[in-house]
UniProtKB/Swiss-Prot annotation:
UniProt enzyme class: transferase
Protein name: Putative pyruvate, phosphate dikinase regulatory protein 2
Presence of keyword Magnesium: no
The entry's keywords: Kinase, Nucleotide-binding, Serine/threonine-protein kinase, Transferase
């Protein structure tokens, strides 16, 4: 190119969507604010060598720069060979770095197309699960509870919220409902036939100690109806009734870590 008024043509060639090369190109172009005439063409899902050669030939005819994110070693070799023979400006974002990392670590690369997109899909699935679990935490919502991968129920201080958030970070949509004898559970919860339900429980003394510690931390009286053994036994009795009605798998969380309880739940969810 002789001046900034000429059109800079860039071809993105990928065996997947081509997002990686596109981001790199856009990041690079920010270093050239005076280049106002830029034309970017994307050629995604290139799986055939002849198709690849056709793109390279077009790049030669249009004096375009070619940027690739191709995992296939044979495709990369073909691209480099054609570019060298025909003096095409050619940038290979993938193979050289893969080779360097492989040599440096002796690790074996996946050599899988679209691995970043799959990683992004997993990331957004996790974000969606976290957003759902926050919305359906502590019985705040019931409308779309059937979308949950699991429902966790239990009396106060049985680790419902920490367990829900831990599982949400693993991509599971979790709803949780606190069980209080004076607060009825909506009928639509009982109508969910395919919803996997887990009931959390512990001994009255264990729960009482946790509640007293919680009250002291908040600067409240450690002696109240909320902390009394009689009240807690009443709540646990009510919880057992709810567990039966919901056909819940019961988990005793006493002295268990969140990871232990989550592992147990994940085993059940994996069977679905």
């Amino acid at each position: 190119m002789k001046d900034n008024n000429e059109v800079l043509k860039l071809f993105i060639v990928s065996d997947s969507i081509g997002e990686t090369a596109q981001r790199m190109i856009h990041a690079t172009l920010t270093q050239f604010p005076d280049l106002t005439q830029v034309e970017i063409k994307k050629f995604p899902y290139i799986k055939d060598e002849q198709e690849f050669l056709n793109v390279l030939q077009l790049a030669k005819e249009q004096n375009a720069i070619v940027a690739t994110t191709l995992v296939s070693e044979s495709f990369n070799a073909l691209g480099h060979q054609f570019a060298n023979e025909h003096q095409i400006p050619y940038v290979d974002y993938m193979s050289e770095l893969i080779s360097i990392i492989k040599q440096h670590t002796h690790a074996k690369p996946l050599m899988e197309s679209g691995a970043l997109r799959k990683l992004n899909d997993e990331y957004f699935k996790r974000i969606e699960a976290i957003e759902y679990s926050v919305k359906y935490d502590d019985g705040k919502h019931f409308t779309d509870i059937g979308e949950a991968d699991a429902l966790i129920v239990g009396v106060s201080r049985t680790s419902k919220t920490p367990l829900s958030m831990y599982l949400a970070n693993k991509g599971y949509k979790i709803a949780n409902i606190p069980l209080v004898p004076e607060v009825a559970i909506p009928d639509n919860v009982f109508q969910q036939k395919n919803l996997k339900v887990f009931g959390l429980t512990a001994s009255p003394n264990y729960i009482a100690n946790i509640r007293r510690n919680r009250a002291e931390t908040l600067g409240l009286s450690s002696e109240s109806n909320y902390n009394s053994l009689e009240r807690i036994k009443k709540e646990l009795s009510y919880a057992e009734e709810v567990f039966r009605k919901l056909n819940a798998t019961v988990i005793n969380t006493e002295y268990k870590s969140i990871e232990e309880s989550a592992f147990y739940i994940e085993k059940f969810l994996a069977k679905r």
